[in-house]
């Protein structure tokens, strides 16, 4: 415990120094187009805070649900968040919710379109329970953005927002990209000339959010098209077809000249399509942070120690000095160590040389932060905590944006608190979600449990269940239980059970109500399916969102 606190203290001290240097080196947000950004949104606007969600359902049916979820993504840590809203018998609701930062949210369990919500504001919803009509208003920038955006989106939206699948080929994809760049330039010109009349009367804060949402719209459509193309041109083992491959360098050749308002723009966090832009940009443009090590063909051997294997594949130096390990690492890298800080620097150089991008750009820093904050690991051992501390320390030289520094430290602090047990649930005062989860586990106590939250309309969910049939059959006599849980509102019994029967999908099939589903999504903070949990025989969660394997199940059965 003392070691971890020392590591955190050191990271805080160095990051504080780094942030100070960042403020000296460049302004928080400088103007790129005329009057954009306005300067109304500063670093503090990207901090976490509270907001009020209130409103009313009218014309509700007698058996309507009593809760719905506000969902979204913390685009700094790349973690989903879920907040449950309780509905009173008269249809009204009023909740004070916490947000990781201002941005766009979605609604699960109710037919409500996405909405912008700023920390410190109130989001007001009037929902017609018999249809899909919703009136969205609110205080401050929240009210302004939600009032203007539907009309602004309609004015500037392209007639072609989705890539026609039947027409997709290499030439079409490059032409599609060029169309989206022309749309992007048209929007940038309108912003630069200040000719968007719908923005008249809006506050500078609201104008910045709305302008950024316009810029993000064609960019996100180009990125989604590439995402579709990437999956379409790969075989089942995800290997590309050389005859169909499009070079990322040629597809994204437009970014360099526009990087000031696309790549080095923190306001993209607040855009209506911000999550799509950030996630696809990370995977298709800035993926050197994810895959450069594979391109370098660095693989460990089964005979390597854990420390040596971690260095070979993740560039992590062992925490305590060992002369023998030092010799082995130098031998592997031909006399020059490559610690994780040098590896991240190599990644930045690779991206910069390919796309001619500024290595200090906000989007590049954000992608690296996502790489470092990949905390999808349920173990609480000191090795993993130390490894993450090393990765964060190695990334520090690349972080110059104060908002990135703030969220990096905050996310790691929360990660350590959770893993060290300081924020454990008080067993004497469990939440409804805790109680429901406990009741699901109790029936299968003493078994290894694979819990899969799925939906009939989810293709990856159905494929995962089909792929697991052999594994379910293999362990049918062992103390292993496969639980497939779905929301009966979204996955009605008749079509769901037909799919299960027709495809001989064994296991325990559990249908829960929409309210129960909301309790569990809130407890585990997931807003997409499939979402899976692997639970050991003592009832402890050991993995999230990791496909089950025979080797892992055998390990848990020992």
Question: Across the structure, where does each feature detected by a protein language model lie?
Answer:
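Bacterial Sec-dependent N-terminal signal peptides
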Residues: 1-26, 455
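Oxidative protein folding and maturation machinery
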Residues: 131, 138-446
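Conserved redox-active cysteine motifs that mediate thiol-disulfide chemistry
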Residues: 453-470, 487
């Amino acid at each position: 415990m003392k070691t971890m606190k020392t590591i955190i203290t050191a990271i805080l001290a160095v990051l504080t120094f780094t942030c100070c240097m960042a403020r000296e080196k460049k302004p928080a947000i400088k103007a790129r187009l005329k009057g954009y950004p306005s300067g109304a949104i500063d670093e503090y606007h990207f901090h976490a805070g509270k907001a009020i969600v209130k409103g009313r359902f009218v014309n509700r049916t007698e058996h309507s649900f009593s809760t719905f979820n506000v969902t979204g993504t913390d685009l700094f840590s790349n973690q989903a968040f879920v907040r449950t809203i309780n509905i009173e018998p008269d249809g009204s609701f009023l909740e004070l919710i916490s947000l990781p930062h201002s941005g766009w949210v979605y609604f699960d369990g109710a037919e409500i379109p996405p909405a912008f919500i700023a920390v410190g504001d109130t989001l007001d919803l009037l929902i017609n329970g018999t249809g899909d009509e919703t009136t969205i208003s609110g205080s401050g920038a929240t009210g302004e953005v939600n009032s203007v955006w539907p009309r602004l989106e309609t004015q500037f939206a392209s007639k072609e927002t989705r890539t026609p699948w039947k027409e997709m080929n290499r030439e079409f994809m490059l032409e599609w990209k060029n169309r989206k760049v022309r749309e992007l330039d048209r929007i940038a010109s309108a912003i630069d000339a200040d000719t968007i009349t719908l923005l008249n009367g809006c506050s500078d804060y609201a104008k910045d959010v709305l302008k950024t949402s316009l810029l993000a719209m064609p960019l996100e459509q180009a990125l989604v098209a590439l995402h579709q193309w990437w999956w379409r041109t790969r075989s089942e083992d995800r290997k590309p077809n050389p005859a169909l491959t499009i070079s990322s360098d040629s597809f994204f050749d437009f970014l360099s000249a526009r990087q000031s308002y696309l790549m080095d723009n923190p306001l993209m966090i607040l855009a209506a399509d911000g999550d799509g832009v950030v996630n696809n940009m990370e995977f298709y443009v800035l993926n050197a942070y994810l895959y450069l090590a594979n391109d370098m063909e660095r693989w460990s051997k089964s005979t390597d120690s854990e420390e040596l294997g971690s260095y070979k594949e993740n560039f992590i130096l062992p925490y305590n000095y060992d002369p023998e390990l030092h010799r082995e690492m130098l031998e592997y890298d031909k006399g020059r160590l490559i610690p994780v800080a040098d590896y991240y620097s190599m990644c930045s150089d690779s991206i910069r040389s390919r796309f001619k991008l500024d290595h200090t750009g906000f989007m590049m820093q954000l992608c690296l932060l996502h790489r470092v904050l990949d905390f999808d690991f349920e173990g609480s051992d000191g090795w993993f905590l130390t490894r993450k501390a090393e990765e964060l320390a190695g990334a520090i030289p690349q972080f110059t944006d104060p908002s990135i520094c703030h969220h990096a430290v905050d996310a790691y602090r929360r990660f350590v608190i959770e893993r060290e047990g300081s924020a454990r649930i008080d067993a004497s005062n469990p939440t409804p979600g805790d109680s429901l989860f406990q009741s699901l586990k109790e029936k299968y106590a003493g078994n290894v449990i694979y819990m899969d939250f799925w939906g009939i309309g989810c293709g990856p969910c159905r494929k995962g269940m089909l792929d697991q049939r052999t594994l379910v059959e293999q362990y049918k006599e062992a103390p292993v239980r496969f639980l497939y849980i779905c929301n009966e509102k979204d996955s009605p019994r008749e079509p769901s059970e037909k799919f299960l029967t027709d495809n001989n999908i064994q296991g325990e099939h559990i249908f829960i109500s929409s309210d129960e589903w909301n309790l569990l999504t809130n407890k585990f903070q997931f807003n997409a399916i499939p979402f899976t949990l692997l639970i050991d025989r003592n009832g402890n969660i050991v993995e999230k969102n990791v496909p089950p394997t025979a080797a892992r199940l055998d390990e848990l059965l020992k």
